[in-house]
Regions:
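Catalytic Zn2+-binding segment of zinc metalloproteases
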Residues: 125-141
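A metal-dependent hydrolase signature that marks the N-terminal structural subdomain at the beginning
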Residues: 21-96, 100
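Metalloprotease/metallohydrolase-associated module, dominated by Zn2+-dependent proteases
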Residues: 80-94, 140-188
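Short amphipathic C-terminal alpha-helix that caps PH/PH-like domains
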Residues: 121-125, 169
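Active-site scaffold of zinc-dependent metalloenzymes
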Residues: 82-116, 128-131
Length: 188
């Protein structure tokens, strides 16, 4: 079976605006310890990704809900931190699919300020939820058709963007701004 690698990028061309939407915020039904375990559908692939996820779940009701929502999908989402090209702060890749499960890898570019990294994580988790909502997306052809239907390709070359992911990043930024007076904490 041939594995297709597809990039769903968070090419953030705009500075994230701070908007707040705390209506309907609820505690997630899964504790952070479960979400960070190997039984979770969202798995941290390195130590920095785990630290980032711990901060994100604690500080952002949006991210806590996203991770909870991913538990009931056919996706296994691996989250890692790594260096990426300069214009790309994060990306979600469909890395493979079987009849029962699809694998997505989210990469968050480091180094960076933790506040910004958490916002990018929320953006990329939204892309994972967009994929989860489209069970027919299983390869590069169906992924491209899906993202051209729900979003756009701002820079070409297989990088896609959606208004939903941009909004998720803005919402997470607002949640962090409301909960953390000091945003300058470095990731590394």
């Amino acid at each position: 079976m041939r594995t297709h690698t597809v990039v769903v990028s968070a090419v953030v061309l705009l500075r994230l605006a701070v908007v707040a939407d705390h209506a309907g915020a609820q505690d997630p039904p899964y504790p952070a310890a479960f979400v960070l375990s190997s039984a979770s559908r969202v798995r941290c692939l390195d130590r920095e990704a785990r630290r980032l996820m711990e901060v994100a779940i604690a500080a952002s009701p949006t991210i806590a809900r996203q991770v909870t929502d991913l538990q009931s999908t056919d996706l296994i989402v691996g989250v890692e931190t790594s260096s990426l090209q300069r214009k790309t702060r994060g990306e979600a890749r469909l890395i493979g699919a079987t009849p029962a499960v699809r694998h997505v890898r989210i990469t968050i570019r480091i180094p960076g300020a933790r506040f910004d990294l958490v916002s990018v994580l929320g953006h990329e988790l939204q892309h994972a939820l967009e994929l989860a909502a489209a069970p027919d997306v299983r390869d590069t052809v169906t992924l491209r058709a899906h993202y051209l239907r729900i979003g756009y390709e701002p820079l070409g070359r297989g990088y896609y963007e959606t208004d939903g992911a941009l909004e998720a990043g803005r919402r997470v930024s607002a949640e962090l701004a409301a909960s953390q007076p000091d945003r300058r904490v470095a990731a590394r």
